[in-house]
Amino acid sequence: MIMLIKVFVLLLVVYILHNSYKKYKKLDKNELKGPTPIPVLGNLHQLSSLPHRDLSKMTKDYGDIFRVWFADLYTVVISDPVLIRKIYVENHESFRDRPKIPSMKYGTYYHGTAASMGEDWVRNRGIVSSAMRKSNIKHIYEVINNQVDVLMSTMKKYEKRSEPFEPRYYMTKYTMAAMFKYIFNEDIGEDEDIHTGEIQKIMGPMNQVMEDFGTGSLFDVLEISQTFYLKWLELTEKNFPLLLKFFNGRYEQHLETIKPESPRDLLDILINEYGTNTHDDYLNIASTVLDFFFAGTDTSSTTLEYLFLMMANYPEIQDKVHQEVKSYLKQIGKDKVELNDRQSLPYVVAVIKETLRFKPVTPFGVPRSCVNEITIDEKYFIPKGAQVIINYPSIFENEKYFKNANQFDPSRFLQTTTTNTASNEESSFNSNLAFIPFSIGPRNCVGMQFAQDELFLAFANIVLNFTIKSVDGKKIDETISYGVTLKPKTRFKVLLEKRLI
């Protein structure tokens, strides 16, 4: 027994020494600055329940690009839009992969658009982009437009009854129903409860996955535990199998009824594009569909929830939006906003952009991995295998790019330049160029246009028809809750008052 203890202690000492050497050794003369790590944990002990805030504070000490250790995962944090473009656009080939960690591998095994790597990603991106181009634009518009009609009908019922309206519930239903129609050509009834109906079959497991993986796990980034952690997930995690079971039912139905020459929805198009010859084809289709649900519902619904919050807290801005929409529609003789009205409603677009900036939904986006060691601008060395993340809140709160960044001011997106208040000099960087909520480069959000259309149509028609007020006449709490997405901490409700159009 004593011998076993001695062996264990010896192995532990060797492990800690090896782990320390890895973290403390000099990599390159241009290696990035960063906080001093400790063995095993790296810099994890310096992160709180709001890690994006902690990393933003580190920016003040180490600059707009620095390194931290998430246990054994060397991570590069970037808060400079110029450097982001040099990395994600000019050197895209070196940063197109995802980190090889258990949570990224589990469930999809690097299939689909979000998790695939290398040439597999090139093929997947090409197929999905082609599939989306083949989706009839008119059909996509009708999908979103019909869901807006359903949403307006529901909100009118709440307004007539003078009942508080919960944005989170109904914005989730709106985005989920649009995705069901777009991908599966299925209609979700206006009266369907998202906690008991068809939506719940995918939303329940999705929410649990985001809750389980959203805050990260030490075992994910501790090299010694990664193999065991992946096996643990495969044996105990129940939600991804439920998601695949849900998808498989739709997939089998589509295989039985598909007419390749006249696809009904995105799933039909994906089946046509990928084929059904191998299990890899199936996994790519399944993973791509789930990618759309994960990326295209929670982020859009949360942004709409924030729009409700900001309109209730900033009634003067809400009135300005309403006046712009009402005046424009009166001029052209319509009573509803359509997609082709977007260019004529710049303030509506500016409010959506400012909400995405002021209340960013994703703190870091989906991380990238460095394929080969590289030096950016001859002074920023990034080693092979490094994880790369963008700290969006740090960029969006930076006075260098957004004057009076702590103020909710949509008019900034109606201007062409910003002023650097620190030096009182005009910034050479256009605020719109620093505004990258959907990431940039070849691996940016593939569903960006769909999301923008969803947001614009819903928001413009909501403010056209209703005045949004807090239930008690006070400002709604804007505190956030950290996870895969940054949501309002409180599931708030609002009162709706009918506007005269």
Swiss-Prot record:
Under Pfam families, the record lists:
p450
Cofactor dependence is on: heme
The UniProt keywords, alphabetically, are: Heme, Iron, Membrane, Metal-binding, Monooxygenase, Oxidoreductase, Transmembrane, Transmembrane helix
GO cellular component term of the entry, any:
membrane
Task: Tell me which PANTHER family the record gives.
Answer: CYTOCHROME P450 508A4-RELATED (PTHR24300:SF363)
- Keyword Chaperone tagged: no
Q: Does the keyword Cell wall biogenesis/degradation apply?
A: no
Membrane topology, as annotated: Single-pass membrane protein
EC numbers, comma separated: 1.14.-.-
Question: What is the enzyme's main class?
Answer: oxidoreductase
Cited InterPro entries:
Cyt_P450, Cyt_P450_CS, Cyt_P450_E_grp-I, Cyt_P450_sf, Cytochrome_P450_fam2
Q: Which GO terms describe its molecular function?
A: heme binding; iron ion binding; monooxygenase activity; oxidoreductase activity, acting on paired donors, with incorporation or reduction of molecular oxygen
What family is reported?
Answer: Belongs to the cytochrome P450 family.
Annotated residues that bind heme are located at 445
Q: Which SUPFAM superfamilies match?
A: Cytochrome P450
Indicate what this protein is called per its UniProt record.
Probable cytochrome P450 508A4
Q: Where in the cell is it found?
A: Membrane
| Native source species | Dictyostelium discoideum
Residues crossing the lipid bilayer are 1-21
